[in-house]
């Protein structure tokens, strides 16, 4: 199987058609995504294709494959919540839909369809309905398309009905604000009726709607099967990929799903899907960075700000804040008005404690659009870094009012309440985050912290375990679990957690080693305690740290060597001399122990010749 060498004429034409088809159906974010991806291809290639030329250097045969993460349903006016995760994988079985009209659109474009097709004959009605859609008159658009029979008109009619009923469900839900009878999420009672309208469809766009309704009804497996069928019929509908990603529970499930996608593994769409989904799962790796670099190469989409943003987000999740910051700076240099993922950039500046740059960014973007949730989060981070937590909460709450499904805002609001020692409000914010997306470890971790503030360690432990299951290589989560186990007296489990934390920890880390040494000492397992103290000393000396950082470990090792038979007294003396000659707080104790160890060395030296003589004459 030949791998894809780059973007070819067919890909360029498909992106052009996808932009128009998505726009005609009201999938605005999908249309924006495909058109921006098209613009990221060099104008020379695009113009050559438009003029009927040939991209000989970009000819391709069958593409190969890759892995990816789950974006939210950005293409929907009301973003639907994530369906609950289930363990089994959907089987991609059943026929690929027979979609002659869709294929004709891909080959010729909508404008070249025969005049007798329903879509062409209903074009005036579709145009009028699209105008109503743009004016957010969804019921009126539905009425205009009531007697239309083409698949495009049917899609737009049902999609308008969906948006209208979602808005109604939102209004009814908000009527119960601050009421204990308010359900966790809005309930759309019309979903089953809408599903009945598309349940037997074979059109890829209607299959997408079917998958959307199934996902909202928490029928995840069926939703995944329908969206895979939709992708097989029209692969450049980004909303379908977003919906598919929202159904993915973890990295393992994603790996299994990739083999069910009806595209080669190295197809750009599959690789883009992998990058986005793993970012959404907060679990990218260096492999995703290399995929971004490949797709940003001259043969693919060298000017794609979206891919650059995905690369920056992956670096952020990998805690490479310096490179992530430089990537965002490059994005803003190319487009100073680029708002997407600006909240991630603000998180990076927050972590780096870069107050000046964060303040400048906040003032610049507040002037651009104060009603974007990303910008509200940016302003919230700005106030949080200045320790103005009440103002930070105000802006994070504003972000959730603009988009109830905006996960970061709920999580950051919870963090602010923790800073304010308002555990109950923090728990409420984190629970809202979990309701939006159960795959985000940060909300589970936040719940654990909030319950820890209330000294409810069993509850904390439960939530830390949920977070660890989603992010098994995060040092903080294992440390948090270990501390909870210590608090409830389950010392052996605490030891296991701290040992597990050492696996992904920085090789120069000493805190966890010190905790393990302390626990083993409390259990009178002195040899184990000394082993971890020696590790602390080795790391500190290799890093040329001040003696104060490892003085206690030196004393512990020296004390052990002085107590055990045939202990290494010279090593004990070396460590004690280090501490005694420093300005550590244990200087006095080190000086006393040094006198004792010198006496022991002298006595051992005196006894040794006698023992040798006895051995010779025995």
Residue ranges and their predicted role:
Residues 150-155, 203, 237, 267, ...:
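Residue-level recognition of tetratricopeptide repeat
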Residues 26, 136, 165, 218, ...:
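Residue-level detector of the short coil/turn that links helix A to helix B
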Residues 153, 206, 240, 307, ...:
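TPR alpha-solenoid repeat register
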Residues 133, 162, 215, 279, ...:
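Position-specific recognition of the canonical hydrophobic site in helix A of tetratricopeptide repeat
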Residues 231-232, 297-299, 332-333, 366-367, ...:
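Conserved structural position within tetratricopeptide repeats
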